[in-house]
Amino acid sequence: MSINATLFVQAIVFLILVLFTMKFVWPPITKALDERAQKIADGLAAADRAKTELAAADQRVKQELAAASNEIATRLADAERRAQAIIEEAKARANDEGNKIVAAARAEAEQQAIQAREALREQVAALAVKGAEQILRKEVNAGVHADLLNRLKTEL
């Protein structure tokens, strides 16, 4: 064989190798590369979707936190208003109770003063009768002179 025939045979073998490679080797390689490219594209798309979902979730969390903060502030204000109302109500009840106690004490003092005056009248009447007995040197009968003694008590 000459160089030209060898070259021609090598070209044919190379052509057969290229055809064999293109028919049997190249399709699985391109398929694997395409699948890999598709996986990468799907992964990038999923990452973009996850990024937008994360941003949306972050926004929802911020809104819910703001709403919760507002609700907490409202509840605290309501609780404070209720506490003030309870305090004012307790003050009013205590004031009413104090006024009742003072009124009862005044009524009791007035009653005691009336009783003391009555006892004093009784004592003054008894002293007046005793004085009259000694002046008259005779005994005054309380049953007989009850009307006179009652008039004397009322005058005192």
UniProtKB/Swiss-Prot annotation:
Gene3D superfamilies linked: 6.10.250.1580
Location of this chain's protein in the cell: Cell inner membrane
Subunit annotation: F-type ATPases have 2 components, F(1) - the catalytic core - and F(0) - the membrane proton channel. F(1) has five subunits: alpha(3), beta(3), gamma(1), delta(1), epsilon(1). F(0) has three main subunits: a(1), b(2) and c(10-14). The alpha and beta chains form an alternating ring which encloses part of the gamma chain. F(1) is attached to F(0) by a central stalk formed by the gamma and epsilon chains, while a peripheral stalk is formed by the delta and b chains.
Gene that this sequence comes from: atpF
Transmembrane segments: 7-27
Pfam family of the protein (one): ATP-synt_B
Keywords: ATP synthesis, Cell inner membrane, Cell membrane, CF(0), Hydrogen ion transport, Ion transport, Membrane, Transmembrane, Transmembrane helix, Transport
One Gene Ontology cellular component: proton-transporting ATP synthase complex
Top-level division of the source organism's lineage: Bacteria
Membrane protein topology class: Single-pass membrane protein
Family membership: Belongs to the ATPase B chain family.
Matches recorded under InterPro entries: ATP_synth_B-like_membr_sf (IPR028987), ATP_synth_b/b'su_bac/chlpt (IPR002146), ATP_synth_F0_bsu_bac (IPR005864), ATP_synthase_B_chain (IPR050059)
A Gene Ontology molecular function term of the record: proton-transporting ATPase activity, rotational mechanism
Protein name: ATP synthase subunit b
Function as written in the Swiss-Prot or TrEMBL entry: F(1)F(0) ATP synthase produces ATP from ADP in the presence of a proton or sodium gradient. F-type ATPases consist of two structural domains, F(1) containing the extramembraneous catalytic core and F(0) containing the membrane proton channel, linked together by a central stalk and a peripheral stalk. During catalysis, ATP synthesis in the catalytic domain of F(1) is coupled via a rotary mechanism of the central stalk subunits to proton translocation.
